[in-house]
Amino acid sequence: MPHGAAKRQIFRVGAIAQGKRPAAKTPREEETDMTQYDARNISMMMDLYEMTMAHGYFKEDKVGDFATFDVFYRRTPDGGGFAIFAGLEQVLEYLENLHFDERDIEYLRSLKIYDEDFLRWLSGYRFHGDVIAMPEGSIMYPDEPVMTVNAPLIDAQLVETAILTQINHQSLVATKTQRIVRAAQGRSVADFGARRAHNIDAAVYGARAAYIGGADSTATVLAGQMFGIPVSGTMAHSWVMYHDDEYTAFRRFAELYPDNAVLLVDTYNVLDSGVPNAIRTANEVLIPMGKRLKGIRIDSGDLAYLSKEARRMLDEAGLTDCKIVASNSLDEFTIRSILDQGGCIDSFGVGERLITAKSDPVFGAVYKLVAVHEGQACRPTIKISETFEKITNPGRKQLWRVYDSDGWAIADLITKEDESPDFSGAYAFVDPQKPWKRHVFSNHTIRGLRELVMKNGKRLRPAPQLKDIRSFVKRQLDTEVWPEEQRFENPHHHYLDMSPAYYKMKMALLKEAQQQG
């Protein structure tokens, strides 16, 4: 299904957004209408304290107050050099359809926490904020504001949990997948993770994130239908075990799918029966039909050794074009090890360690208040901590990326919102972790990393094609991100610097906060 068509289907929630329920469907209609999968009102997806604080602001007559919150993360999973920003489109769709229906209001009333004036106000609520964000698929680094919400205070508070849920999950999986794709060194990678995902949403949106991160396909059919991701798959051991013998299982499969026969060869013994029976199937079934055996899959054992032996046997049988697919608890480290040992593998099916990011399964993006609007003025706010990394970057700001003459990104830069730095000559940046140091750059190019994507609760552009987001990731990695930053171990540290004016403002706020404390 084309990506645009899928988007129109799965988010056809207009009736619900207006407080109406779709007409009841017959069982057959429920089976075929996939709009029902995502036609869910998730406005109540929040921590209780978000609603409790919103009620408090309402009682304090703060409905008209505005605030600014930044989304950023502090640490890249697996000790990586960068992360991939994913989940933005789901955030924008959530915000655009945010409302509270009768069932939501009735449940909130049952908690006996909130008064009727507030519940009546909620019944007519819509999100009216602005969102500034990096494009989805952007390379991002710790502590920089990848997304900013400028909104009425209550609006901005209510949406924290849902925003972080979507950004954290998809950014985690996209980042992990990209590591796996890099380890595969140009070989195809497929997402095989649905059955080990934490639930259906994690499988489906994890597949979306994996595709953004560079996976070529997914085995999850629902994700293919919803997002237009290419789907792929072979057979299970049960197919082989159900038939009288391995050869019969292979023969029947090849007869049914002569153009896409990939045979699972490790049900009994890879080298003694699996590969020989695959070769026999190619010779006795496919070649007489004018077809070729597309591939074999090995799902257990010593993948490096077995793939080399299988390759030798296939080549000796004249099946040099037959591909070898490997699966079985793979990640970037096992894939790299297999290839370092000379493993003859053309494609990897990666499951649980991709879809759950098993080695480091928490992304850790946060949502912090950085400014309060008082009339026409905007007062920056800062959170201090005993831990340097948890001191927030205050105020409304701009985020830039600096490039050398060859187009490689050398630093990111935070400036005050109203700054217009002159980058035509030499410019000194402050390293906030080592403020005695100055990074001086001259004759470099610079571009802003974020754009206004939502105004007054309405998106300003159509959702991009998922394949274009995926291509954007690849283009950045190929042309902007230093190979040294892409190392798995001890990657080069990407600088996040501050303009002198911004750093001065932050230090003044820190001093003021310390005096108040």
PLM feature spans:
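Gly/Ser/Thr/Ala-enriched C-terminal appendages of enzymes
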Residues: 33-65, 69, 78-80, 317, ...
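Short beta-strand/loop segments at the ligand-binding rim of alpha/beta enzyme cores
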Residues: 316-326
